[in-house]
Amino acid sequence: RVLCHGDSYSPNFLLSEQEEMSLIDWEYSGMGDPAGDLGTFIGCSNYSVEQAEKVLEIYLQEVPDTKTKRHYLAYVAVTSYYWFLWALFQESVGKPVGEFLYTWYRFTRQYGQLSLELYLGEK
């Protein structure tokens, strides 16, 4: 368990003119699995699976073994589902979230299926 941001998507990363990066909006932070932050980052993108795997390599600074890869990619499904439910609530109270609703739904299904295949040894 490590300190996790909990809402690690691109608008919360600020880059100064000196190219120093800051991470803002810590309201969802707490101790947790670092795969959750990367799962949210990928889940809030429109990356293909191949691009997501490259992001994972960059994040880990190495090519992950199968166990690590499936763990992190499963978190894309888990966090996408979490944010999908959040989005449904927002929509229900008149606060549209735009295309994120569909992206999170799609990634929940896509990465959930991929992760299941990886856990079952089918990929």
Which residues does each predicted region cover?
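Conserved short-loop catalytic and cofactor-binding motifs
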Residues: W26, G43, Y72
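Amphipathic alpha-helix face/heptad-repeat signature
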Residues: L73-S80, W104
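ATP/Mg2+ or Mg2+-diphosphate-binding catalytic cores
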Residues: L85-K123
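Active-site acidic catalytic loop and adjacent metal/ATP-binding pocket
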Residues: R1-G36
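Active-site activation/catalytic loop segments of kinase-like enzymes and analogous catalytic loops
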Residues: A35-P64, A77-K95
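ATP-dependent phospho-/nucleotidyl transfer catalytic cores
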Residues: R1-L3, H71-A74
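An alpha-helical support segment within catalytic cores of ATP-dependent transferases
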Residues: R1-G6, E17-Q18, P64, T108-Q110, ...
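Short amphipathic alpha-helical segments and their helix-coil junctions
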Residues: E53-H71, Y111-L120
